[in-house]
C-alpha cells in the first residue's frame, strides 16, 4: 500500500535522510527522487535539515496503523517527492572553488551562538559573518 505525507528533515548524510513526522518525532529513512536532485539549483544538496518535504512510502497492509518508524525501514525507505517552500535558511559558500552554495539549515526559528571566552580563540570575523547571515536570511 502506498502512503503519502509531509515530514521534516531531521538529518541528512549524503543521499540518505532521516525524516520526522511531528509531533511524534518518529524518525524514518528516506531517499531523494532523482528528478528533484537535477532541478536547476546552485546548492550542493537541494534538501537541508529543517526542510518540510512530501514523501511516499510503500508499506505492507498489516502495518498501516503502526508508527512510521516501524513501517518504513532502511531496506525499503520512503521517497522524497517534493520540497515545500522555505521560510528562511542559513547558507554558506561551498568549500570548493565552484559557485555552489551549501544550505546548512532551513526553516530556522532561532539561532544560538555559543563561543568560548579564552580557548580556543574565536575569530571576530567569523562571529560577524554568522550574525550578518542570520540577519540577512531572517533568522
Task: Cite the ranges covered by each PLM segment.
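Charged helix-capping and loop-helix junction motifs
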Residues: 125-131
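N-terminal accessory targeting/assembly segments
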Residues: 1-124, 135
